[in-house]
Amino acid sequence: MTLLTDATPLVKEPHPLPLVPRPWFLPSLFAAFNVVLLVFFSGLFFAFPCRWLAQNGEWAFPVITGSLFVLTFFSLVSLNFSDPGILHQGSAEQGPLTVHVVWVNHGAFRLQWCPKCCFHRPPRTYHCPWCNICVEDFDHHCKWVNNCIGHRNFRFFMLLVLSLCLYSGAMLVTCLIFLVRTTHLPFSTDKAIAIVVAVSAAGLLVPLSLLLLIQALSVSSADRTYKGKCRHLQGYNPFDQGCASNWYLTICAPLGPKYMAEAVQLQRVVGPDWTSMPNLHPPMSPSALNPPAPTSGSLQSREGTPGAW
């Protein structure tokens, strides 16, 4: 039975872990600037070309684009402040030489020790070098919102990309319709603003559509944007449950409890009660190397049904 490792040394991490925490002010300022930029261009759009269409009886354009703006703004702000699935350290964690094993679809994964958070991280958990935290089911760090994308906020990220695509497309179509219907009128501020907004929307729509396609393919195959090149996983993905199940686990499945750090041990919050770390951790070797019973399920969330942690 081959024992798979889900992290170093067989996984090459794309960015080395920093020795010191990275500054947070400039990335946060950049994320806030993106929100202001969205509001600014939306204000120009609604104040000029969309206003002209509404004044001439075309109320469908402001209603549709207004709804898409609200959805986009909500998803952007929600993603900025969302919890990606942070796993905090616990002081009762065993040392790095202790071996933990978890089973995923009849494959045994040896959990890797995180030297920053001082605990054995589950499969697909990665220590983000920008946030200096371990994120469950890590996908990537999004600098546009200055937040990691992981198990608990991936659906908000997909909603943001989809709503931005629809909103950019709606703004582009609205501006083009406005320019076509005002060809008989002299050049004005409304036309200049419509051209600026249309060019900006078109420039945003192309990369967003490509990103949406890449993420859709990633979800369909239970893949990740961040993917270490594991020699033992070439051509095999034990987390793939099938296209329909992958989409359900990503978008619709319950997120499960949050994990919080206590003074002595890692705890799982379930209302006012909590379950101690031994009930959340996978069993230790060598007993963990025994194959699970046929009735035992696979991991939950984006990995499958409930696992050992």
UniProtKB/Swiss-Prot annotation:
Residues 112-162 form the DHHC domain. The active site is at residue 142. It catalyses: L-cysteinyl-[protein] + hexadecanoyl-CoA = S-hexadecanoyl-L-cysteinyl-[protein] + CoA. Residues 280-294 have a biased composition (Pro residues). The chain crosses the membrane at residues 29-49, 59-79, 160-180, 193-213. GO terms for biological process: peptidyl-L-cysteine S-palmitoylation; positive regulation of aggrephagy; protein targeting to membrane. One of its GO terms (molecular function) is protein-cysteine S-palmitoyltransferase activity. It is found in: Golgi apparatus membrane; Cytoplasm, Perinuclear region. It is a multi-pass membrane protein. It comes from the Eukaryota. Residues 280-309 are annotated as: Disordered. Palmitoyltransferase that mediates palmitoylation oproteins, such as RRAS and SQSTM1. Catalyzes palmitoylation of RRAS, leading to increased cell viability. Acts as a positive regulator of autophagy by mediating palmitoylation of SQSTM1, promoting affinity between SQSTM1 and ATG8 proteins and recruitment of ubiquitinated cargo proteins to autophagosomes. Belongs to the DHHC palmitoyltransferase family. This is Palmitoyltransferase ZDHHC19. The lineage of its organism: Eukaryota, Metazoa, Chordata, Craniata, Vertebrata.
